[in-house]
Amino acid sequence: RCHAVDYVVQGEGEEAFYQLISALQNGKDGLQEEIPGVRGRHISGELMGSTEAVEVKDLSTIPFPYVEEDMEDLEHKIIYYESSRGCPFSCQYCLSGNKNTVRFFPQERTFKELQWFIDHKVKQVKFVDRTFNCAPHHHRPMMEFMRDANTETNFHLEMEPELMTEWETQILCETPPGRIQIELGVQSTHKKTLD
């Protein structure tokens, strides 16, 4: 309906957007290429392209979004960071919980990238993970890393209160003040909404 929009990338855009840009740079129409996840209006006015949203199967294929050249402008700033995608819940009103699956970036890579932020004196690393504490095998080693790091960097985590245990309480007590900031994801207090 909006004639100012040529293309829409549905779902996770890393692969589809790259393919679309490559097609356009090579003088091709991104709609004729039938790129999964790309839809738009052809010059004729007809809607064309893929109708399915794309999901990146292997998160390790997604490159680290920050480069050395950016850091001069980003030092002492807030950086958004993702260590997982998806949500284990299926709240009716939420876009993130539509599949009840969570995928994780490789943990070794995550530690390396967090250390990179620390080395570059980032003020805050704001995790955009929907539910940071949804999987103990994933979040506990990272919280230990945050606790033990020699840094002034603050880590902002969105956590589900019902999934917090004595372990999380203990590690927060052992962590230097101001190191970890928790945002509790209270979705609703209305039982009917939650059902």
Question: Model-flagged regions — what are they?
Answer:
Residues 1-52:
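Glycine-rich beta-alpha loop elements in corrinoid/cobalamin-binding modules
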Residues 13, 43, 55, 67, ...:
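Residues that form or immediately flank small-molecule/cofactor binding pockets and catalytic motifs
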Residues 24-25, 56, 97:
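Amphipathic, positively biased hydrophobic alpha-helical segments used for protein targeting
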Residues 31-33, 55, 74, 150:
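A generic structural signal for short, non-catalytic loop/turn and secondary-structure boundary residues
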Residues 52-59:
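A short, sequence-level motif marking secondary-structure junctions
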Residues 60-195:
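Radical SAM [4Fe-4S] cluster-binding motif and immediate context
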